[in-house]
């Protein structure tokens, strides 16, 4: 899923928009996305900053990656030889527009250090 100035018209048939909206309003996912807008972070940094359990955070990060809301910014090898993954939000902001005719969900791409291609 590519995010730039992406819009979703919410209706019962549009499952993608409903899934994205549900996920973003989940307190857990919201904390993860907000935590990684400015800087990429490891799972441990995200957990510590937001007081989140590690196993649940890994599951949410996988789901957010699958939905195209997070990406792997970089992978480094630490002094113990272990791989450390840094995650970053693909979105800078979300706008929900409600009126009598429609419900519109609009994403603004996070321009900070995004990879050239964000269609993971």
Over which residues does each language-model region extend?
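Short, cationic-aromatic polyanion-contact patches
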Residues: 17-26, 42, 73-98
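A short acidic, leucine-rich amphipathic alpha-helix
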Residues: 45-49, 64
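Short, Lys/Arg-enriched N-terminal segment that forms or immediately precedes the first helix
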Residues: 2-22
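Short helix-to-turn junction characteristic of helix-turn-helix DNA-binding domains
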Residues: 36-39
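Amphipathic alpha-helical dimerization/coiled-coil segments
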Residues: 91-120
């Amino acid at each position: 899923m590519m995010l730039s100035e992406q819009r979703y018209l919410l209706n019962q048939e549009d499952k993608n928009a409903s899934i994205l909206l549900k996920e973003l309003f989940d307190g857990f996912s919201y904390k993860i996305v907000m935590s990684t807008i400015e800087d990429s972070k490891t799972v441990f940094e995200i957990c510590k900053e937001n007081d989140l359990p590690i196993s649940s955070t890994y599951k949410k990060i996988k789901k957010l990656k699958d939905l195209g809301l997070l990406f792997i910014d970089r992978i480094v090898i630490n002094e113990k030889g272990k791989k450390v993954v840094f995650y970053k939000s693909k979105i800078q902001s979300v706008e929900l527009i409600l009126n009598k005719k429609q419900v519109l969900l609009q994403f603004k791409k996070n321009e900070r250090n995004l990879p050239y291609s964000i269609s993971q």
